[in-house]
């Protein structure tokens, strides 16, 4: 009888713990550097997906999140602007760590003529 009670308790505890999702910020990635824009909208990204306004490219060999990864990009604008884009391409980017579409770049609070802005991204 005692064995059945202990077994039932283990099952109850195990099923309760299984209902929770444990995530750690330690696994989150934070990348500092310039954010630039490129006109990839409508073109095929490295993921094979047709790129939209909220897709982005990360720097080849520098940071390699999976295709489709949700990325939060932060520009050091005042007030601070944040956009959400999705990694579906890669590029060489000699002066940047993230490329976004013109629409996404403007959403960071800068005109396209600025070209690049200091910031960071995380996922």
Curated annotation (Swiss-Prot):
UniProt-listed InterPro entries: RlpA-like_DPBB
Induction note: Positively regulated by the two-component system YycFG. Expression is maximal during exponential growth.
Domain of life: Bacteria
Pfam families on file: DPBB_1
Name of the protein in its database record: Uncharacterized protein YdjM
Lineage summary: Bacteria, Bacillati, Bacillota, Bacilli, Bacillales
């Amino acid at each position: 009888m005692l064995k059945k009670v202990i077994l039932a308790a283990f099952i109850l505890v195990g099923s309760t713990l299984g209902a929770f999702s444990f995530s750690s910020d330690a696994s989150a990635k934070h990348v500092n550097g310039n954010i630039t824009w490129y006109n990839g909208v409508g073109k095929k990204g490295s993921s094979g997906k047709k790129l939209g306004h909220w897709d982005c490219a990360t720097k080849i060999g520098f940071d390699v999140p999976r295709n489709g990864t949700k990325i939060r990009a932060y520009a050091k604008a005042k007030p601070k602007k944040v956009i959400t884009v999705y990694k579906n391409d890669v590029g060489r980017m000699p002066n940047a760590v993230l490329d976004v579409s013109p629409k996404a770049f403007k959403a960071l609070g800068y005109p396209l003529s600025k070209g690049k802005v200091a910031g960071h991204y995380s996922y």
